Amino acid sequence: MREVLYMTDKKNLRTPIVCVMGHVDHGKTTLLDKIRGTAIVSGEAGAITQHIGATEVPIDVIVNKLGDPKLRDRFMVPGLLFIDTPGHHAFTTLRSRGGALADLAIVVVDINEGFKPQTYESLQILKRFKTPFVVVANKIDRIGGWASQKDMPFAATFKKQSPDVQGRLETKLYEVIGELYNQGFAAERYDRVTNFQKTLGVVPASAVTGEGIPDVLMVLLGLAQKFLEANLQYSAKNPGVGTVLEVKEEKGLGATLDVILYDGTLKKGDTVVIGSLGEPIQTKVRALLKPRELSEIRYESKFKQVSEVTAAAGVKISAPGLDGALAGSPIRVATEETLGEIVAQVKSEIDEVRIDTGSVGVMIKADTLGSLEALVHEFQKDEVPIRKAEVGDISHRDAVEASTVEDPLYSVLIGFNVKVHPDARDFLQESTVKVFTSDVIYRLVEDYQKYVKEQQELAEKKIFETIIRPGKFKILPGCVFRQSKPAVVGVRVLGGVVRTNADVMLENGNVVGKIKGLQSEGENIPSAKVGKEVAMAIEGATVGRQIKEEDVLYINVPERHAKVLEHEIYDSLSTDEKETLDIFLTLKRKNNPFWAK
C-alpha cells in the first residue's frame, strides 16, 4: 500500500463502529464470520443474517490476522466493533441527531454478480452521510481457475495465480470499479490508491477462504486512524450515550434494549433516559449483559452480566418500563442534577425526527427512527407529498385513514421493514388502498413511481376513450357508392384516427355531416387509423353538394376536447395525430384566434 495509514501519537481512542452493508447473499455475515473465527453463519437458515448484532473484535485478534506482531504498537484503536445486519438497515437505525453513528462501513459486492439493488442503496446512504468506507469485492475464489491460498493477504495470493486467472480477476474488478465511478465514486484497487481521501479502496477477497481479509482489516484500521481521530476520542468518565439498536422481548427479562454505546460509561443501577413516541422513558438499569469478545449480541446464551461498559460496545440492557422505547432513539445516562436537562435533550432529538407532513400525500410507516428518516428523505427528494410518517407496523387505524383519501395517488400506505396487522390486512383486502412493503428503500420509491405512472396512464386511457381525437381523411376518386341519406364513399385516412359518431368538416370550417359507419373488407369497424382505406357513411352530406371526390375533411373536435388534447395529453399523441391537431387548430383559429385556448 503506497499511502502510510498509521499514527504515532497515542490517543484515547474508542473502538470504531463498523457497519457491514451489501446485497443479500453477497457474503456480509460470512465475511464477519471469517474475521471472528466463529461459526455463526453455519447455524443460520439460508446463510442470511437474521438478526441485528454487534461484535467486538479486539486489536490483538486483528493483528494476529495480519500476521505481523510489530503492527500492534502502530494501531492506536483498541479494536473494531462490527454491526452485522441485512443490507443497510442497521446503518440507518444507528443515528445520532440525524447523522450516521457508524464511523466506517464495508460494502460487500459479489465480484462475479456485480451490483444489486441493496448495493446501490448502501452506496446512496453512505454518500448522503459522508461515511468513509471500503468495498470488498468478495468471492474471488469462485473465479474460474482460481487457486485458493487460505487466509493469505491479497497481494500474495494474486501472485500465485496464472496470468489468465489474474486477467479474469482484473476484468471483473474493473467492472466493479467502473460501476462505482458511475455512482459518483473515484475508486481503485486498494494497493494502487495513492490518496484514500480522494479514492475509494476496493479489496478483492474471499470470505470463505480468508484471502484478502487481512487487507480489509488493515485498510479499516488505517482509515479509522487517519480520518476519524477526532471522532474517536472519548472520555470514560463521561456519562454513557448510545443508540437503541433493537427492542426485544426476552424470557425472564421482559422488554430489553440492544444498545450501541458510543461515548462514556454505562453502569448497572444508572438512571437512563430513552426516546419514545410519547414522553421520554426514565428508568434504572437492572442488568447489563455484554457479549464476550468474539461473540454475537444475538446469541443470548453467550452473555455475561457486567457491572459497567465503556464505549464503544454493544450491550443488552434490562430495565423496567422499556415497552415504548424506539429503535434508533437516543439513550443517555442522567444524574439527579442533569435529569431534567437530559430529558429535554432526548425529547428535542425525537422531535427533530417528526416529519413535516401536509394535508395531502402518502402515509409512511417504518420500523426505526433512522429508517423513517431515510425513507422520508428519498420520497421528499422525488417531491412526493407525505401526509403522515410514523414508526410502527401498519395498523387498522392506518388502513381506515388511508381509505378515506379519494385521490388514488395518495390513498397509499408505504411500509419499510414493518408488518401489516391481521385486522388491517382484512380491511385492506376489501378496500382500494394501495400498499407497498419492502426492506429496500429505493425499491419502495421505484414501486411507488411505477404505480403513479400506471395511474396516470390509466387516467389518460380513460380520457382517450371519451375524448374525440383529431383525424384527417380524403374522399377517394371513383369511390362514391351512394350519394346521400347517408352518403357512402371510399376514403383514405391521412392523419390521426377517424371514428363513428364524429362530426366532420371541410378545410373551410364548414361542418357537413356525421360519420354513421365505417367498413373494411365488408366488416363494420369502430375506427380507422392513418394509412387505412375504408368505406365511410356520412349522414347529412350529399356528394356533389356539400362534399365531392378528392375533398380533404377533418374530424370536428369539440372545443372542450381540443383544449384537453392540446394542453393535457398532447405529448401522448402520435406524431401524425399531433400534425393533424395542429392543422385543425390553425383552421379553427382563422376566424377565432382564441378558439380552444
Swiss-Prot record:
Location of region: G5: 206-208
Phosphoprotein found in the keyword field: no
Residues annotated for GTP binding in this entry: 22-29, 84-88, 138-141
Record Pfam families: GTP_EFTU, GTP_EFTU_D2, GTP_EFTU_D4, IF-2
Coiled coil ranges: none
An example Gene Ontology molecular-function term: translation initiation factor activity
Residue numbers spanned by region G2: 47-51
Span of domain tr-type G: 13-229
Signal peptide start-end: none
Disulfide bonds listed in the record: none
Renumbered residue ranges of the record's region G3: 84-87
GO cellular component, one term: cytoplasm
Membrane-crossing residue ranges in chain numbering: none
Positions of the UniProt region annotated as G1: 22-29
Alphabetic keyword roster: GTP-binding, Initiation factor, Nucleotide-binding, Protein biosynthesis
InterPro entries, per database record: EFTu-like_2 (IPR004161), EFTU-type (IPR029459), P-loop_NTPase (IPR027417), Small_GTP-bd (IPR005225), T_Tr_GTP-bd_dom (IPR000795), TF_aIF-2_arc (IPR004544), TIF_IF2 (IPR015760), TIF_IF2_dom3 (IPR023115)
PROSITE patterns the UniProt entry points to: G_TR_2, IF2
GO BP annotations listed: translational initiation
Residues covered by region (G4): 138-141
Domain of life: Archaea
Family named by the database record: Belongs to the TRAFAC class translation factor GTPase superfamily. Classic translation factor GTPase family. IF-2 subfamily.
Family matches, as NCBIfam families: aIF-2 (TIGR00491), PRK04004.1 (NF003078), PRK14845.1 (NF011418), small_GTP (TIGR00231)
Official protein name in the record: Probable translation initiation factor IF-2
Taxonomic lineage: Archaea, Methanobacteriati, Methanobacteriota, Stenosarchaea group, Methanomicrobia
Gene name for this UniProt entry: infB
